[in-house]
Amino acid sequence: MEADKIEVGQTYTCESPLLKKSFKGTVEKIYDLSVLVDVHEFEDTDAKKVDDLNGRLVVPFYSVNPS
């Protein structure tokens, strides 16, 4: 997704190599090439990893999709 279309406080579907499945999260902060996402909807198989990461991930713009 293009950076100018991503908004803080909005929920998006994202992907990360750290998790096995895609997840939904709310953008907390926008960086130069990525965003900080608060993860709130994820698969049970990723629950431990999300907990280890304190429910937050930095993902690149190209891994963010509209929900």
Regions found by a protein language model. Name each.
Residues K21-K29:
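Short beta-strand-centered aromatic/proline hotspots
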Residues I30-V35:
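Short, conserved beta-turn/loop elements at beta-strand boundaries and strand-helix junctions
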Residues E2-L18:
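Short coil-to-beta transition motif at edge beta-strands of beta-rich domains
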Residues E43-S67:
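Intrinsically disordered, low-complexity, charged/polar segments
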Residues T13, K29, V59:
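Short, electropositive, low-hydrophobicity segments enriched in small/polar residues
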Residues I6, P17, K29, D51-L53:
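A generic structural micro-feature
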Residues L36-H40:
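Short, acidic/hydrophobic/Gly-rich beta-strand patch recurrent on exposed beta strands
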